């Protein structure tokens, strides 16, 4: 499955780069699929197929990779708008609502997505779900001095929250903003993403949570058919 999943990720990354035009200001996402997209973008810039592109990254991971590939970058504060943002997701529901933040970058990712004229999400088919949070925990970035109190508040809201621990350092994960992450599980999953996003963000000490509500314009889904990787486009229909 790992090889097939990698094929799907490459397929959607390449499809996303096809939407990039000369002169664009691009939001460059984080995570494994977004990294493949950034590499594909770097190759097109190096070959001259794309020109005058400027990127705005959503994480230190993306900043390092873009610099390695000689992709020109600007900070979020240096741009007034973003033409196109491309990013991955941890879960996508049928209404195009997302959970992001598996890489603890969801604060910057949401800022960039909100600024973009168009936000395209790139995922493999395993990320499509009927309901958010049944499998993937909801990340919530919190101030270090308040995490335990916020954990109690989230419990009162029906969520079981655990402090995310680092894998290759002693202690918790620390975000690019210097904060901590609580991973939250709601009994029965998330039935009303819009209301929950606001409710969690209203808790004192919470910086941002990983629910992305009504931000996505298109989802590019990598799929395997007859052993071959392909891409299906899902576009949000505005009512």
UniProtKB/Swiss-Prot annotation:
Pathway the protein takes part in = Carbohydrate degradation; pentose phosphate pathway; D-ribose 5-phosphate from D-ribulose 5-phosphate (non-oxidative stage): step 1/1
Subunit details = Homodimer.
Catalytic site positions: 109 (proton acceptor)
**Role played:** Catalyzes the reversible conversion of ribose-5-phosphate to ribulose 5-phosphate.
Q: Does the keyword section mention Isomerase? A: yes
HAMAP family, sorted: Rib_5P_isom_A
Question: What does the entry list as the binding residues for substrate?
Answer: 30-33, 87-90, 100-103, 127
In alphabetical order, the GO MF annotations are: ribose-5-phosphate isomerase activity
Instruction: Identify the keywords attached in UniProt to this record, alphabetized.
Output: Isomerase
For this protein, the Enzyme Commission number is 5.3.1.6
Q: Which NCBIfam families match?
A: PRK00702.1, rpiA
* Annotated protein name in UniProt: Ribose-5-phosphate isomerase A
A single Gene Ontology CC term: cytosol
């Amino acid at each position: 499955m790992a090889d097939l999943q990698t094929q799907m990720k490459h397929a959607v990354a390449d499809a996303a780069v096809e939407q990039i035009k000369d002169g664009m200001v691009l939001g460059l996402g984080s995570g494994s699929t977004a990294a493949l997209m950034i590499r594909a973008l770097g190759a097109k810039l190096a070959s001259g197929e794309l020109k005058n592109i400027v990127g705005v990254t959503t994480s230190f991971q993306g900043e390092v990779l873009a610099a390695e590939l000689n992709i020109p970058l600007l900070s979020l504060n240096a741009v007034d708008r973003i033409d196109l943002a491309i990013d991955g997701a941890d879960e996508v529901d049928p209404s195009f609502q997302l959970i992001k933040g598996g890489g603890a970058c969801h604060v910057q990712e949401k800022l960039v997505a909100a600024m973009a004229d168009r936000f395209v999400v790139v995922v493999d088919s395993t990320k499509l779900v009927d309901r958010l949070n049944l499998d993937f925990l909801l990340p919530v970035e919190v101030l270090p001095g308040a995490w335990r109190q916020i954990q109690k508040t989230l419990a009162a809201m029906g969520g079981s929250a655990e402090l995310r621990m680092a894998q290759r350092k002693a202690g918790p994960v620390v975000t690019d903003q210097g904060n901590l992450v609580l991973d939250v599980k709601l009994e029965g999953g998330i039935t009303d993403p819009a209301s929950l996003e606001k409710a969690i963000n209203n808790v004192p000490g919470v910086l941002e949570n990983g629910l992305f509500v009504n931000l996505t314009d298109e989802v590019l889904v990598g799929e395997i058919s007859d052993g071959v990787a392909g891409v299906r486009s899902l576009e949000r229909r505005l009512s």
